[in-house]
């Protein structure tokens, strides 16, 4: 992502590089659910629709594509698992962890709305200062809400956070007390970053994108939450295209996100997806 400042420290430069780069073999997976109000056949129907959206996007853009949704106790994924670098989507839990430690909201505005790397690094440093280990604090935050990631201890953009786990955390965003402000500003992403899920109604999302120079692949990821009448569905997606073509990846994300939100809305309307309406005490 764009970093307009110069003269950073070596550590900060490394961190910013890995995020500003803000990057599996396709497969289909459904995360196990111990209990859910939607039946197995309902989930199979939704999974089939997700598979179709993934296949259409992959063929149209010659891309590796993955999606995941989380509603209630059920998490359904299709396509690529999204186990590459998480890029700037990791700024969401970093901002939440920093707010727990009293971070300035203006830094959250910059890190989330504009995906500013300097602001994200400052938030990360604040968590490190207060908690002693920023990577552990962010990882513990995710674990507390049933989402799991391998957080890189310095270059946080290279953390690994699979799509199904991002979707799980996305569904919990409205329920995390310290995430209230992050949830709010996710609706105010700057115009040039209003791509894919961020364009869709009743959907709040954070993007992350980057180039893998060794593989010559460009990755665009998003995760967030779709909310209707107080009910929430976590959503995550990833598109990996060949070469350095940001515009191609962005177009693929738009195409995929519109299908994904349509599947979620239809699934909720038809009772095939049963989103949570209340938050659990934690």
Residue positions per predicted region:
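N-terminal export and membrane-targeting signals
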Residues: 1-13
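C-terminal motif of bacterial Sec signal peptides marking the signal peptidase cleavage site
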Residues: 17-21
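Bacterial Sec signal peptide processing site at the extreme N-terminus
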Residues: 24-34
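Penicillin-recognizing serine hydrolase domain
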Residues: 27-29, 39-65, 74, 128-282
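Short, conserved catalytic-motif segment at the N-terminal edge
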Residues: 62-83, 99
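Acidic helix-start/capping segments at beta-turn-to-alpha-helix junctions
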Residues: 70-75, 107-129, 274-281
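A mature extracytoplasmic/lumenal domain signature
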Residues: 71, 82, 88-90, 115, ...
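Active-site SXXK
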Residues: 83-103, 111
């Amino acid at each position: 992502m764009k970093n307009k400042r110069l003269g950073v420290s070596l550590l900060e430069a490394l961190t910013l590089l890995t995020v500003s780069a803000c990057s599996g073999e396709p497969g289909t997976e459904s995360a196990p659910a111990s209990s859910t109000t939607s039946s197995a056949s309902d989930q199979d129907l939704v999974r089939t629709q997700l598979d179709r959206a993934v296949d259409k996007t992959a063929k149209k853009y010659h891309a590796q594509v993955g999606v995941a949704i989380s509603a209630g106790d059920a998490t359904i994924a299709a396509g690529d698992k999204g186990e590459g670098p998480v890029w700037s989507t990791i700024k969401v839990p970093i901002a939440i962890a920093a707010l727990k430690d009293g971070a300035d909201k203006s830094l959250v505005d910059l890190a989330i709305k504009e995906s500013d790397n300097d602001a994200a690094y400052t938030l990360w440093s604040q968590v490190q200062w207060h908690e002693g280990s920023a990577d552990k604090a962010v990882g513990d935050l995710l674990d507390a809400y049933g989402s799991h990631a391998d957080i890189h201890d310095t270059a946080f953009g290279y953390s690994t956070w699979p799509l199904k786990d991002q979707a799980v955390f996305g569904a919990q965003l409205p329920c995390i007390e310290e995430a209230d402000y992050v949830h709010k500003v996710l609706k105010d992403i700057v115009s040039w970053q209003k791509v894919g899920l961020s364009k869709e109604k009743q959907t709040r999302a954070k993007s992350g994108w980057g180039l893998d120079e060794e593989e010559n692949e460009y990755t665009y990821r998003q995760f967030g939450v779709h909310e209707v009448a107080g009910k929430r569905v976590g959503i995550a997606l990833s598109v990996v295209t060949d070469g350095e073509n940001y515009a191609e990846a962005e177009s693929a994300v738009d195409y995929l996100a519109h299908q994904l939100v349509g599947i979620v809305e239809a699934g909720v309307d038809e009772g095939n997806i049963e989103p949570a309406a209340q938050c659990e005490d934690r």
